[in-house]
Amino acid sequence: ANGPYKIPNAQVDAYVYMTNKTLGTAYRGFGVTEVATAHERQMDRIAEKLGIDPLELRLKNVLQNGDVGITGEIMQTMAVKECLETAAANIGWKDLPDRWTDEEGNLCGKGIACFNKLTGTPSTTSVLVKMNENGSLYIMSASTEMGQGVTTTLPQIAAETLGMALEKISMAPVDTAITPYDKTTTSSRSTFHSGNAVLEACEDIKKQLCRLAAIKFGVAPEDVTYTADGYIQGRSRPEQRIHINDVGTSGILHEQPPVVAVGRYGTSDIFDPPPVDGRQSK
């Protein structure tokens, strides 16, 4: 929440309130846009008072790589200045008047604004996938369904990966006491992060099912292969063939450890921020 400008002096008072009343809030697009609208209106008013071009005022004050933000963080990959310069060049900022009337009599004007938004990285997600004794699949994920379709998307990914029928796959209700860790259900990240975690877990499920099928066939695990349509068959004896839905009902699971896999996906290697405590009054 640094904002895009250098602000060497600031004081922020924060208060925490506890309430038993449920809050109504937005699904997307809240917080940053409201604050950005306020500080960009302020920048325009300051520029007008000082008689400075609004673009010039912004370029003089934007944070750049190596600058220290208001919370004490060192800025990295900060390209606000370059973005402003590129936008201004593409719209012909210098050549446009502040206000004009077009051929149809419409009043026109020019404006420019900037803000920065956190990336949500580093970010990690874990899921747990379990093959039940009746051949169905159970996915445990902390990604919350709020209308975006995650309870459909994750089973679809599992169904395609394992070659299973979609109706054989279900999602567990979200409960932080039992579901694996997920950073947040925000930023349009559920399909990408949780989906990749489900994909990893299902690949592990494949290996476990191949091991169980090999026991049933009386062959080594490396002598069976997993087909795209959800069958496990022998390499040297293709007639040895069983569908994964039947592995659970064949009785093998009663004598072996449960088929459970944990999948994890993270983007921590993209950006590694330096460890900082921020700046606050003790």
Per-region residue spans from a language model:
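Mobile "lid/hinge" segments at catalytic clefts and subdomain interfaces of large enzymes
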Residues: 1-64, 202
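Generic long, charged, amphipathic alpha-helical segments
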Residues: 167-173
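Cofactor-centric catalytic regions
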Residues: 1-5, 50, 56-162, 174-282
